[in-house]
């Protein structure tokens, strides 16, 4: 029986740094793997069109290399996840969880030094409560 796997990456590269080998094992085992990326780069944060396009191309490349079954993006401003309300984060993440219906979710480390990781951990962890679904 195959599983539905959801990897929650706050920034593109967190999926590989956090559990790249595990994702490849899941894929090899016939599981479906889904990638949820929390953050995105925006011009109003000082990122150039070239940097944004390079990041988008990197996401496409990694998506193809892992053969993700789906890729979802919350498009939160990188380094500014604490500017979003917890209700908004939970609502947006819950929509994706309801769509993917994962059996296993890989989360970032709760005590990571990066504030984006801590905020997003709290939001997705709240989404894993059984009574929400």
Model-predicted regions and their roles:
Residues 1-133:
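Active-site beta-strand->loop->alpha-helix modules in alpha/beta enzyme cores, enriched
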């Amino acid at each position: 029986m195959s599983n539905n796997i959801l990897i929650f990456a706050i920034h593109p590269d967190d999926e590989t740094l956090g559990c790249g080998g595990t994702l490849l094992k899941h894929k090899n085992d016939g599981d479906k793997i889904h990638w949820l990326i929390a953050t995105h780069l925006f011009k109003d944060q000082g990122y150039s069109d070239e940097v944004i396009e390079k990041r988008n191309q990197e996401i496409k490349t990694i998506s193809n290399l892992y053969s993700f079954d789906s890729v979802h993006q919350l498009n939160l401003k990188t380094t500014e996840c604490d500017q979003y309300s917890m209700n908004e984060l939970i609502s947006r993440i819950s929509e994706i969880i309801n769509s993917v219906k994962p059996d296993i979710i890989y989360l970032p480390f709760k005590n990571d030094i990066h504030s984006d990781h801590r905020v997003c951990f709290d939001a997705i962890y709240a989404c894993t409560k059984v009574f929400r679904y």
